[in-house]
Amino acid sequence: MLSKIKDSINSLRGITEKKLEKKDGTKYIMFGGKGGVGKTTMSAATGVYLAEKGLKVVIVSTDPAHSLRDIFEQEFGHEPTKVKGYDNLYVVEIDPQKAMEEYKEKLKAQIEENPFLGEMLEDQLEMAALSPGTDESAAFDVFLKYMDSNEFDVVIFDTAPTGHTLRFLGMPEVMDKYMTKLIKLRKQMSGFMKMMKKLLPFGGKDEDIDYDKMLEELEKMKERIVRARNILSDPERTAFRLVVIPEEMSILESERAMKALQKYGIPIDAVIVNQLIPEDVQCDFCRARRELQLKRLEMIKEKFGDKVIAYVPLLRTEAKGIETLKQIAKILYGEEEKEEQKIEQKVGQ
C-alpha cells in the first residue's frame, strides 16, 4: 500500500498520499478546467499512479466527448472495464443516451404503482429527453452510483469542460430542492386522497396505491443526494484539481470555476499547470513563448497561491499509452522535480 509521506505536504504527492492514508471510505479526485488543457491526461496518469501503488481505482469520464479510450488505446463503455495490464484499474465512459434510458426506467419503475401521476410524469420524462441539461441529470444518476459504492479505493472523475462540470456539480443542490418539494407534494396528496376515500363513493379506487411506500422511496432518494453532497464537500474524502495552461483565457476561466466550486462547498486542493515549454529549447519562437508563459505563471501564483501548484512540461510526443502515462505521473507526483524547481525559482525572481 502507500508508504509514509516523506515529501512536503506542499506537493501534489504529499496531499494525495495524506488523503489516502486515512481509511474512512472511498476517496474521490476530480479533474476539471477549460477544454483542451489536459484534464483527461492528468486523470489517466493519476489512475495509473495510484494503481501502481496497489489501490483499486476507477476513472469515470463524465465528458460526452470521451478521450480515455484514445489515451489508453483501448475501447471502454458504460460499465467498468479493466485497463489492459492491470487488475486494479478500470475505466467507465458514461454513455449519455444509455444513462438517460436507465434514468427514465428507474423513475418509471418508481411511479408505475401510481396511475394518477404515471401518465403525467411519463410525458414529462419524454420532454426531458429533449431539454438542455438532461445529459448532466442522467450522468449525475450514474455519478451517484459511484458515490454510493465502496467497491473502489479511489474514484477519479474526468470531467467535461468547465461550464458542463459546474452544472453537473450543482445538481445535488438543485435535486435536493426538487426532492424536498416533491416530498411535500406527496405528503399533501396522501392526506388529500385519504380524506377523499372517506368522503366520496369512488374514493376507494386508489386503494392499491401505497402512498407511504412512495414517500419512503422519495425520502431514500433525497438521503442519497444529501449524502453525495456531503461527500463532495468533505476535504478528507474529495479533492477537485484544476488543470490550466499558462494562457490568460485558461487562467481566468479556472479562477471563475474556483469561485463557483467554493460556492458549492467543493474543496480545491491543487492547480496543475500543463504544457509548459522546457527551459532548454533552442528556437527563438519557443524561447519567446516560454518567457510569456513565465509571466502567466506569476498570474497563476497570484490567483491560486494558496493551493498546491504542480507543473507538467509540454511533451515531445502525444500523451498516449501506459508508459507515457507513467512518465507523466512521475513528473506530476514529484518523482522528477528538477523542471518544477527551475520554474519555481524563475517565478520567484
From Swiss-Prot:
It catalyses: arsenite(in) + ATP + H2O = arsenite(out) + ADP + phosphate + H(+). Its EC number is 7.3.2.7. It is an enzyme of class 7 (translocase). The keyword Cell membrane does not apply. The keyword tRNA processing does not apply. Keywords: Arsenical resistance, ATP-binding, Nucleotide-binding, Translocase. PANTHER family: ARSENICAL PUMP-DRIVING ATPASE ARSENITE-TRANSLOCATING ATPASE, ATPASE GET3. Anion-transporting ATPase. Catalyzes the extrusion of arsenite. This is Putative arsenical pump-driving ATPase. The lineage of its organism: Archaea, Methanobacteriati, Methanobacteriota, Methanomada group, Methanococci.
